[in-house]
């Protein structure tokens, strides 16, 4: 499921990233690779703040739609 469908406080794991090669590369460079745990810190209208590895990142709704996760 897309990370968009998660809520504040959820702990999920990246399953895969979909989209163009450029989008996959950009999200991969940000740490969104299969198997990586992610904590949803804040979600508002699809824009999100997440904790991944030791960083907090803001991602847009468009980016979030490309990140598939699982609980």
Question: Can you say where each PLM-predicted feature lies in the sequence?
Answer:
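C-terminal structural segments of small proteins and small subunits
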Residues: 3, 11-12, 25, 41-71
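Conserved hydrophobic positions within beta-strands
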Residues: 14-17, 38-40
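Short, conserved turn/kink motifs that form compact alpha/beta structural patches or helix kinks used as
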Residues: 18-23, 29
């Amino acid at each position: 499921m897309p990370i968009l469908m998660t809520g504040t406080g959820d702990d999920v794991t990246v399953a895969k990233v979909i989209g163009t090669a450029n989008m996959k590369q950009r999200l991969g460079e940000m740490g969104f690779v299969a198997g990586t745990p992610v904590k949803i810190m804040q979600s508002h209208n699809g824009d999100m703040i997440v904790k991944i590895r030791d960083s907090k990142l803001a991602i847009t709704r468009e980016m979030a739609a490309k990140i598939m996760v699982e609980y």
